[in-house]
């Protein structure tokens, strides 16, 4: 009897053990299959269909830096999401390559997901679109609605189509900021400002109740110039008369009244768009141009897949190195929103020590940042020149303050016509809260061996020797 029970339990255990192993192996095979399938999808080299339309989607923020589309694995696209950034070089490279590629019959620009783009980036993409149009092929843009910056790109297309319920939102340029000076005074906060340069106006928000004359003058200077550039670019690309864009803005209330409040009709009447179409109507138009059958979808290829499909040759022998400096300049290592002096210095040093690097192009797109970090980077560029290698700075949307400082080490500086550049000084700020504590009946006290030991104590008045 005991032996029988033992045999039963052994049989059950073998069955359970078999099922356990089978389940583990099945899970392993499923995971392995998913991994192999994912790898095959991600690393598969796309093919370029004959007569395809190249789809160029500007998504999120247009930036300078990032991995090349032809080399990166886009997990975001695999998950059917949208990318948060678009690399400027990828867009321009794809458009320029398509201009020389007879397999590409046209371009379709998608701008709905474009959130942020600088003036210089708009200008450079516009120039690339103009070069493509010079081949005699068409660029089509369709959107449910255009913001001002989206439209500044779209205006360079051959055909601009808008959804019948959409709008083209041209507003001009404006800015405003809050001034906390009076509030901080009432709260007993004393803000000590140290600066060099009349136009270094950032600290004004903490010590004044409104902008200074210098601040207004500086803002007017760059805004008026930028707005003139936007208007000229749109008017030239669309074949409009000078002043047409401003005319639409100034007469908008009347135009809206005449059109019964229909913003898309206003855009069409002002020749800002070539027609009002739904997405499917635009697809049918593209299909007709390709000679496709009704009901089919037009042959297209995404610009990232297009770049991945093109064969790249490895660099052999001498080459020109390109290093990108983008974002706020800070001490230490580079991060998501800024560039660190250690990271940049290492990249530049690598170029200097590489015997095959014949020259260095530094692409600058930075509003500035730490003075010390900027000097560290500038010195590394200077060492490249001392090593006998030419250094060229190419300025993007911004190259101000520290961004301009590092550029001074170059043999030559090239800026876009709409680059915001210049050096307007430096500043430092330190708030002290002795009056705030007094209002709250909070006392402070202590000792120090020297007057500098408590120099950073924000609960004490600033020593007059610092003023």
PLM features: residue spans?
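Small-residue-centered hinge/linker elements
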Residues: 1-256, 261, 283, 287-392, ...
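A structural motif shared across PLP-dependent enzymes of the aminotransferase-like
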Residues: 274-277
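Extracellular glycan-binding segments that recognize GlcNAc-based cell-wall polysaccharides
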Residues: 280
